[in-house]
Every structure is written in structure tokens, then in C-alpha cells.
Amino acid sequence: VDYIGHRAGHMLVPGLEWEGFDYLRPERRKTRAVMNIGGENLPVVIADRMDGGVKSSSEFTPDYIYCGRALPEKREECAYIIDADMYQGEENTYPAFPYNQLPLVSAIQAPLKFLFLPFGAPSDEYLACLKQHPEIVVISQSNHQNRLGEQRALIHELMCNGLLNPVVIFQHYQHSQEEKSDFQLEAAADMGPLMFDGLCDGVYLFNNGSLSHDDIDATAYGILQAARL
């Protein structure tokens, strides 16, 4: 209750609702599949391993692992995401761009690219980039007091402009292992409405704390299972 209550009195999110959206009968947003993300594919899980961790639970193996600036020496049997300026075209590895590096997107060849994108980024630039690059999957991020509202606004902006790029939702937290239940409740509160509205092609949960990777990955899969349309 306190977590949701903190959104009260937040700054206005100046978004527009796509005219074809129906809150009473939501359908999954139409997207063009990029490899196994979007389209008719089930939503994916991206896991964070910037701390160098390599071992995942056999029960909750992520589809993709974001490793930041360097690939681990020992890799798991899944795909990897690495910062675009460190990308060397390694097998089963794909580049991720921050929104302020849009000019670099065309310079790198890859069948799948990720773009970290907040609502409020210069829309003319990123909309043109997404239209030109259907291989991009958007990773929606937000630091807004009501980040659920801001992430929903970003996806509606994509729909209003006829874009079919898939969207993965990035959520960040700061919890210790002892606060596992708080993490689970907050992640479910942030992700549930976006999942039920059919706006999400994947989940990326990040925690700056002592929570185990297995607990974070299990939470992501639990949210997907509970909210499946």
C-alpha cells in the first residue's frame, strides 16, 4: 500500500492514449517479431549479470543475460546482451544502445539490437530510428515517481505512430535478501498492469542489493505466468 501510495501527487505524464486501445477488453499489442521477441512469441526474461555471475537455476533460465561491458569467460546456454560499443559480433550475442547513441545504430550489423529508451526522449529522433530499424527491441526504462504511467505512455506513443518494435519493460529496485517479499510485491505491482494490458514483450528486473539472481529470475517468470493473456 505504501509503495503504491508514493505515486500520489506525481508530476504529470504528458502522454497520449492510442485510440484503438480498450482497457475493458485489452489485447496484446501487435508487434513484428525480432527473433524470439514479440509477434506471437511468449514474453521473454532478460536477467542482469553485470556482477559477473554466470550460473542460473535450471528451473528459471533467462532467455537473455545483460552483462554490461564484458562477456563472461564461461557462458550459460542462453543469448547475451552487451553494450554496443563493446560488441564484436560474437555468436549468440547482441548489442544494446542507450537512447543518446542513436546515430551508432546503423553502424553496427546485428539481427537483433536493443535500445534503452525512456519516455520523454526526443521523439522525432527515436521514432525515425525505430522505423528504419525493425530489428530493434525497445527496453523501456523510467525514473519517474509513477514509472508505470510513464512506461505505459511510451508504449502508447509507439502505437500512435504505427511502430511494431517489441518492448521489454525494465524495472529497477534496491532490496536485500531479507526484503525478498517487498521486491516481489513491488515488481508485481509495477509489471502486472502492463502485462494485463498486453503491452509487454518481455521483463527485465534489476536489483541493486543482495537478492540472489535465482530469486530475481523466479520473480520475473512468476509475473509472466500470473499475467499471461
Where are these regions (language model features)?
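Active-site beta->alpha loop and helix N-cap motifs at the rims of alpha/beta catalytic domains
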Residues: 6, 11-12, 20-149
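Catalytic alpha/beta core domains of metabolic enzymes, predominantly
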Residues: 1-18, 22-26, 102, 109-229
